[in-house]
Amino acid sequence: MQLTSFTDYGLRALIYMASLPEGRMTSISEVTDVYGVSRNHMVKIINQLSRAGYVTAVRGKNGGIRLGKPASAIRIGDVVRELEPLSLVNCSSEFCHITPACRLKQALSKAVQSFLMELDNYTLADLVEENQPLYKLLLVE
């Protein structure tokens, strides 16, 4: 299973914010500069993360974005569920004549659930805390 770039960059944005000193705000422009992704794409990602409560956006002169909850409270599986369309096959009976007897969708559904359950074992904090090589790559100290 390959995650979409939307989910990939959503996770990267959260990793960047979690790597910053506690309470430090960043900007969408700063995140896009770090990862080389388009600003428009990142705005859409941050908006969805904000609606889900993972990111807090503050407007104004001293505004910016930061994590909306502690990194230890953000499970990676939950973020993927929020950002990723998880339908692996299109099982519409008008497109596939074996749909009434097909067991593939059930098998794939179980595989996706196993994937997400494994990701639920990790929090954002698990990915960033005391990760000096990551901080150096992100130029965060």
Swiss-Prot record:
Keyword Lipid metabolism: no
Positions annotated to bind [2Fe-2S] cluster: C91, C96, C102
Alphabetized UniProt keyword annotations: 2Fe-2S, DNA-binding, Iron, Iron-sulfur, Metal-binding, Repressor, Transcription, Transcription regulation
A single BP term in Gene Ontology: negative regulation of DNA-templated transcription
Needed cofactors: [2Fe-2S] cluster
Regions recorded as binding DNA: 28-51
Molecular function terms from GO: 2 iron, 2 sulfur cluster binding; DNA-binding transcription factor activity; double-stranded DNA binding; iron ion binding
Cited InterPro entries: TR_Rrf2-type_CS (IPR030489), Tscrpt_reg_Rrf2 (IPR000944), Tscrpt_rep_HTH_NsrR (IPR023761), WH-like_DNA-bd_sf (IPR036388), WH_DNA-bd_sf (IPR036390)
Known role: Nitric oxide-sensitive repressor of genes involved in protecting the cell against nitrosative stress. May require iron for activity.
NCBIfam families noted in UniProt: PRK11014.1, rrf2_super
Annotated HAMAP family: HTH_type_NsrR (MF_01177)
Protein name (database record): HTH-type transcriptional repressor NsrR
